[in-house]
Amino acid sequence: MSGFPFGQSNSVGGFSFGSSSATNSSSASSTTSPLSFSFNQSSNPSSTGFGFGSSVSSTPASSTTPSFGFGASSTPSFGFGSSASSSTPSFGFGSSASVTPASTTPSFGFGTAASSSAPAPSLFGSSTTNASSAAPGSSPFGFVTSSASSTATPSSSLFGAPASSAATPSSSPFGAAPASGSTPLFGSSPSLFSAPSSASASNSSLFGASSSAATSTSPLFGAPSSATGATPSFSVASSAPGSSSSIFGATGSSPSFSVASSASGSSPSIFGATGSSPFFGSSSSAGSTPSLFASSSSGATTSSPSPFGVSTFNSSSTSNTSNASASPFSASTGFSFLKSTASSTTSSTTPSAPPQTASSSSSFSFGTSANSGFNLSTGSSAAPASSTSGAVFSIATTTTTSSSTPAATSAPASSAPASTMAFPSFGVTSSATNTTPASSAATFSTTGFGLASSTPATGSTNSFTGFAVPKTSTPASSSQPQTTSPAFSFSLPSSTSTTAPATSSATTTQTTLVVPSSSGTSTAVAPVAGSPKLPSEITGKTVEEIIKEWNTELQERTGRFRKQANAIAEWDKRILQNRDVLLRLEIEVAKVVETQSSLERQLELIETHQQEVDKALQSMEEEAERIYNDERKSLLDDEAASTRDAMYEQSELVERELEHMTEQIRSIIQSVNANQGGELEAIDGMSPLDVVVRILNNQLSSLMWIDEKAEEFSSRIQKIALQGSGGDRELMAPKHWMS
């Protein structure tokens, strides 16, 4: 085979993950080739250099000791999850030892379940399996192992992963629950990336979906092998009693993003999908132990608070006894992600007194499961022998599958596992109360922003809600939870309905709004009768379709934003250009203003010059008039001078008359020419001879008119000459010659 096989049986390679042997572990003769570095070698390995999760065979013979092994069969010097039957590794992570008291505990281990009567606590909180009634020591990091005794009370761990009871497999740090079989850290007896073979107890994988069979284990990333068939990654999971959840919440044969199957004995994942719920959604049904960050396990004993606000509960289930005075209180922290309290009453018995569960909430919490203001997680259900707690952000649908038979009813309860399938939901909780034995009636509710859809606990409830707040299915057992809402929380109150035991086979469902009170009783206000179904955009769609729609919408909005940004950029450019134009215009206007001011100054200067010239002319005129008056007196005294003056004035008069006559003659000639031209144009049918005759006639008439005017002028001249006598000359002499 290749040098790096995954899940190959009986292969020889330098590096392999989870190579399971094809032969039976009981046969001591079947051996594999030496591996320098191996993970989860199920058969008898011979001198492995480095091994993870090598399960030991039943025969203690023919097994050498690796120098560094994880879950090796014999005593490794450093081991992770080695279930050793012979000796104990000096350093082990999750080494679950056998039940025989001959084995010892490792000095350093993660979740090493050793069967010692009084085990010492390990460094990272590997609580050992207690075969007797002794209580194991508390672990600092809280990686829990299952307790074999039903009466033993394991102490709480440092980081809040509780130790569960014997019926419920404990959760590992990453969601793998090492129950009865030897479970290594990175894989069980099946291979790491391939389909695992069936084992006695189902262990959840790291990221993958666990198998749906009751005796199957899940690989790290791969789909598990199941007795009924493997479930795809995006399908509805089948319910399987006993499957454990993976790290991101895929439980049983439920896929990563599917409606989770309700299992009776499943352990939750690290991020709070309780039970067999996937990462985004529904919580499992009865018997689910909490995860690392979110949920708290049900128990009757008090729990010590964890440093990060993850409330832990050490569950101690007492069989065939009524848990009357059990009242667990979760310690409140300053900043908590989830604290859920759920009282686990007696399995298959009717509680004689109602158990009181009280959860104290923190000042700032994400999803306290007990009646908070706005809950993103599941509500606490006071169910007998089954309690589920909500995760941090997983909006889980809690369905209690154990139908408790009331005191007045003698009919046995039908403990059919109810498979609750839900998408991620943000809505009002739905409480389903089952008081009588009922057959597995499958109800299928589809709500968008779904309010409560009440369903019986024994029926398989498929809730495809877009953002619906979880369903809590409470049994008919009378419980009085004391709930305290936090000051600030993201959770709607999950209704804890207190119902009386019913004798008839009827399903009583109601959704009540619980008012938090300081007393031990919960006050049920008026029940919400018909909760309307709110629309949702992501109802019935896969994650890929939702992401594609979001991507297309993001691209469209990005395109619109780019268009608007380009338009704004164009406007900005135009504004900048106009700003430049305005600046240039302002500069030019400033220049024009300066030019206008200089022009005004020049005009003022010219005006002053004109005023000076006017003053000079006035002085000159005054001087000329003065000279004329002085000389006139001398001219009047001389006769010859006076005669010359009169002749000069007469010549000026004649000249003016001649100018007037020339003007008149010019106007007459123009009018005559205009009239003759009009007559010639008016006559169109004239011959050239007629035209010549007409022209000659006009010339003749003109000459005759000139002759007449000349005679008139000559007569007038003669008259003027006759008038120029001596007396007239004297009268004409005093005229102003300068006028």
From Swiss-Prot:
GO terms for molecular function: structural constituent of nuclear pore. The keyword Coiled coil applies. GO terms for cellular component: cytosol; nuclear envelope; nuclear periphery; nuclear pore. Residues 18-67, 79-245, 281-329, 341-366, 399-418, 471-533 are annotated as: Disordered. Keywords: Coiled coil, mRNA transport, Nuclear pore complex, Nucleus, Protein transport, Repeat, Translocation, Transport. It comes from the Eukaryota. Residues 584-674 form a coiled coil. Belongs to the nucleoporin NSP1/NUP62 family. This is Nuclear pore complex protein NUP62. It comes from Arabidopsis thaliana (Mouse-ear cress).
